[in-house]
């Protein structure tokens, strides 16, 4: 979102610049100086020249420095200005709001920007306490008051932070930059779950009943060719969670992903879960029937509360959840997809009466103990069709002229069952064989929803909660929901 950050003195001298896009050159700073700083008539906090936009503010402290961002996309201006004011506050905490101090300790600001914007220019962490906790150098005084260090000690009283007789700050030598990702910070779990970093969960939450609801939502997308071969198939999934937990709980669960099952830490946790009985997600009764073996997860994206360092090392998902509902992660699966339905269409053209004859078989492939709801098969017909003679073994089917389709519906469809449809179209009197031959034959599409069935085979193998302030045992629920995305069959 942000391509670069510039800091000017009150006179218009460029003091600091940091670019996140290689396409930017240092000469771009001259454009802002000429168009805004040297132009007293400009009062707008945003300037757009072609595809380049400058957002700027004046620092409210010290030498009233110019803080400027450069963007080359349709960025959110409100978010950028909020970032600039947060940057101003952090710089003030480090007494870097004066030109001379900024020139001497400019690398401190570079580290701030690495933490606040990451490596791609997108604001990821702008909370003052959280940013300071991740900095390699701590400020001695924060806006005229005392600033507590992450370990709870007063930084001002520490002998490791030297000050001169004039009261000016002298920072120790800059060592190394920390990771630009907030979620991967720290070498220990306790460092990641520092209360200063948990900005998404208030302190002191109390619930009469501790509960966790985990939802594995999947949408299967598939395209079947005329000969029955699968042209493409993949699953887009999300794991949503609703928590009502007291205190500051640390939740941890494992999946049967192929990399995670090879982790030694994962094996230890699974063995521990198998030794304990009770209503846990590790219980086989909570595993969907379609799941088997391991699953290769791709393109995983996580909520900010998840410890990426833990996932990258051991493929264990560990987090302090916000109170309420949220989307915990997204994932993508392409291999070993479990198909819930098989559609076998036989569509022929009768040259004698200009009719289209349909013989369609719909078979459910999920276990017989399960059932699907809201099953809808959308069967296209030629635009010249005025009616259809339909016969079905089960369900309800009708011709919908405004959609040029037959709609076959089932309120409930049991597993391992098969139903058939036979239909003949009735065309208008002026319909010719050429019209029917030129018909593009749009694919048949299917809609459905199956509970406790996993299209990808993904399984939550265990779920544990620690650090909970409540004395009551948390009740944990899990639900697998499989739906159709783009489920199409050619004929």
UniProtKB/Swiss-Prot annotation:
GO terms for molecular function: clathrin adaptor activity. The keyword Cell inner membrane does not apply. The keyword Transmembrane helix does not apply. GO terms for biological process: clathrin-dependent endocytosis; intracellular protein transport. It comes from the Eukaryota. GO terms for cellular component: AP-2 adaptor complex; cytoplasmic vesicle; cytosol. The modification Phosphoserine is found at residues 179-181. Keywords: Coated pit, Cytoplasmic vesicle, Endocytosis, Membrane, Phosphoprotein, Protein transport, Transport. Adaptor protein complex 2 (AP-2) is a heterotetramer composed of two large adaptins (alpha-type subunit APL3 and beta-type subunit APL1), a medium chain (mu-type subunit APM4) and a small adaptin (sigma-type subunit APS2). Belongs to the adaptor complexes medium subunit family. Component of the adaptor complexes which link clathrin to receptors in coated vesicles. Clathrin-associated protein complexes are believed to interact with the cytoplasmic tails of membrane proteins, leading to their selection and concentration. This is AP-2 complex subunit mu. The gene is APM4.
């Amino acid at each position: 979102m942000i391509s670069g950050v510039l800091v000017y003195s009150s006179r218009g001298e460029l003091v600091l610049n940091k670019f996140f896009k290689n396409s930017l050159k240092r000469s771009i700073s001259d454009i802002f100086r000429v168009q805004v700083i040297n132009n007293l008539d400009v009062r707008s906090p945003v300037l757009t020249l072609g595809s380049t936009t400058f957002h700027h503010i004046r620092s409210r402290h010290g030498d009233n420095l110019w803080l400027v961002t450069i963007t080359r996309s349709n960025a959110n201006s409100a978010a950028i200005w909020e970032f600039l004011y947060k940057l101003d506050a952090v710089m003030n905490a480090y007494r870097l709001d004066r030109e001379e101090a900024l020139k001497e300790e400019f690398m401190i600001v570079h580290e701030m920007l690495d933490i606040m914007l990451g490596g791609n220019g997108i604001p990821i962490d702008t909370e003052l306490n959280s940013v300071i906790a991740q900095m390699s150098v701590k400020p001695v005084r924060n806006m005229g008051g005392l600033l507590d260090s992450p370990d709870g000690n007063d930084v001002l009283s520490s002998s490791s932070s030297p000050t001169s007789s004039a009261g000016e700050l002298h920072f120790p030598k800059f060592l190394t930059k920390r990771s630009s990702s907030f979620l991967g910070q720290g070498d220990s779990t306790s460092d990641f779950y520092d209360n200063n970093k948990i900005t998404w969960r208030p302190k002191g939450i109390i619930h009469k009943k501790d509960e966790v609801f985990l939802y594995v939502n999947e949408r299967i997308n598939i395209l079947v060719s005329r000969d029955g071969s699968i042209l493409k198939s993949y699953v887009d999934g999300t794991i949503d969670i609703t928590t009502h937990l007291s205190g500051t709980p640390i939740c941890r669960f494992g999946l049967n992903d192929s990399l995670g099952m090879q982790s030694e830490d994962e094996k230890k946790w699974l063995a521990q879960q198998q030794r304990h009985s009770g209503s846990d997600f590790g219980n086989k009764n909570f595993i969907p029937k379609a799941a088997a073996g391991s699953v290769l997860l791709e393109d995983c994206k996580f909520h900010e509360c998840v410890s990426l360092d833990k996932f990258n090392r051991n493929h264990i998902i560990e987090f302090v959840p916000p109170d309420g509902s949220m989307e915990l992660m997204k994932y993508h699966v392409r291999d070993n997809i479990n198909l819930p339905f098989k559609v076998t269409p036989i569509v022929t053209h009768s040259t004698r009466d200009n009719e289209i004859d349909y013989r369609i078989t719909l078979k459910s492939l999920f276990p017989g103990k399960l059932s699907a709801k809201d099953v809808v098969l959308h069967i296209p017909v030629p635009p010249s069709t005025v009616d259809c003679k339909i016969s079905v073994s089960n369900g309800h089917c009708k011709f919908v002229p405004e959609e040029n389709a037959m709609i076959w519906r089932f309120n409930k469809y049991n597993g391992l069952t098969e139903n058939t449809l036979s239909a003949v179209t009735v065309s208008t009197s002026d319909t010719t064989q050429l019209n029917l031959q030129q018909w593009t034959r749009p694919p048949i599409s299917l809609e459905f929803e199956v509970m406790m069935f996993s299209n990808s085979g993904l399984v939550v193998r265990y779920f544990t909660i620690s650090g909970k302030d409540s004395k009551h045992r948390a009740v944990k629920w899990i639900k697998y929901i499989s739906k159709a995305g783009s489920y199409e069959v050619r004929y």
